Amino acid sequence: MKSKIEIPRDEIIKFCQKWKISEFALFGSVIRDDFGPESDIDVCVTFAQDAHPDLYDLAVMEDELHEIFKRNVDIVEKAGLRNPFRRREILNNLEIVYAA
């Protein structure tokens, strides 16, 4: 699978370092053929053990990624994927962009 957008890797690296993200991956339509001009970008992240983001932090992160990608962004935390069906679907279809 290959993402349907250009990924500004330098900006993503800075973003991940700032927020203590150890893995940043794309999933959903951004890596499928149904990605279109109105599609958002789905991101799955894993935080470093010493990172403790709250809901406000996640909202700020989504805003920052919106500025980077110029699209709406939804973030899910890998550790927070509790539904086994959704977890399997997401984890089987990830494109890792950054890993520390």
Which sequence ranges carry the predicted segments?
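Catalytic core of pol beta-like nucleotidyltransferases
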Residues: 1-25, 31-33, 37, 48-100
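Short, conserved active-site loops that position catalytic residues or coordinate cofactors/metal ions
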Residues: 39-41
